[in-house]
């Protein structure tokens, strides 16, 4: 089972992925958690580095080979491109664009990178890409803005157990359109 935890940078993917990993591992599951950004950077699994946006253009062929070499069938893929890696389930984490803006600014992201990611959240980019690339029955979307990570993980576990997809209920455009003007 491969679980993709995707969403705009700053939404809480790593926090949720690590907590989900710990919960599944402590329950006896032989599972690994892969932080896509770290793996791509450390192992040169990219086509080029985008200097302006301080990010990598992922080489998906190399990344897929790396994932296959991990040695376990059960994986959590933590990253905003994880929905491109043919997962069994896709968890799309969402958060209030102002919360994302504040988190990214506290990480010293450039103003251009903050703006691009806030726009991506406003326009549902990770959700839309997930729907376009995958079977919609695999997708579960969660608003993480005001939820404790433990509650988010419990919702994910319930989705994995019941397999009832839920997405398309979160929209920030009406309240936060001014952020992209």
Swiss-Prot record:
Domain of life: Archaea
EC annotation from Swiss-Prot or TrEMBL: 2.7.4.3
Location of region: LID: 106-116
Presence of the UniProt keyword Ribosomal protein in the record: no
SUPFAM superfamilies linked: P-loop containing nucleoside triphosphate hydrolases
Region of interest (NMP), residue spans: 35-58
Keywords of the record: ATP-binding, Kinase, Nucleotide-binding, Ribosome biogenesis, rRNA processing, Transferase
Biological processes, Gene Ontology terms: ribosomal small subunit biogenesis; rRNA processing
Record flagged with keyword Ion transport: no
Molecular-function annotations in GO: adenylate kinase activity; ATP binding; ATP hydrolysis activity
Residues binding ATP: 10, 12-15, 107, 147
InterPro entries: Adenyl_kinase_AK6, P-loop_NTPase
Leading EC class: transferase
Reactions this protein catalyses: AMP + ATP = 2 ADP; ATP + H2O = ADP + phosphate + H(+)
Family affiliation: Belongs to the adenylate kinase family. AK6 subfamily.
Subunit structure: Interacts with uS11. Not a structural component of 40S pre-ribosomes, but transiently interacts with them by binding to uS11.
Function: Broad-specificity nucleoside monophosphate (NMP) kinase that catalyzes the reversible transfer of the terminal phosphate group between nucleoside triphosphates and monophosphates. Also has ATPase activity. Involved in the late maturation steps of the 30S ribosomal particles, specifically 16S rRNA maturation. While NMP activity is not required for ribosome maturation, ATPase activity is. Associates transiently with small ribosomal subunit protein uS11. ATP hydrolysis breaks the interaction with uS11.
Record protein name field: Putative adenylate kinase
Organism in which the protein naturally occurs: Methanococcus maripaludis (strain C7 / ATCC BAA-1331)
């Amino acid at each position: 089972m491969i679980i993709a935890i995707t969403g705009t940078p700053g939404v809480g993917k790593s926090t949720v992925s690590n907590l989900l990993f710990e919960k599944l591992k402590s329950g006896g599951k032989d599972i690994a958690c892969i932080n896509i950004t770290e793996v791509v950077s450390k192992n040169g699994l990219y086509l080029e580095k985008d200097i302006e946006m301080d990010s990598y253009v992922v080489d998906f062929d190399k990344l897929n080979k790396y994932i296959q070499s991990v040695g376990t069938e059960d994986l959590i893929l933590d990253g905003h491109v994880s929905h491109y890696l043919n997962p069994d389930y896709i968890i799309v984490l969402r958060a209030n664009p102002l919360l994302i803006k504040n988190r990214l600014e506290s990480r010293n992201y450039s103003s251009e990178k903050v703006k691009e990611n806030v726009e991506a959240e406003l326009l549902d980019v990770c959700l839309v890409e997930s729907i376009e690339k995958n079977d919609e029955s695999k997708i579960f979307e969660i608003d993480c803005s005001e939820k404790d990570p433990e509650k988010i993980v419990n919702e994910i576990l319930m989705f994995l157990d019941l397999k009832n997809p839920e997405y398309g209920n979160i929209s920030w455009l009406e309240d936060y359109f001014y952020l992209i003007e």
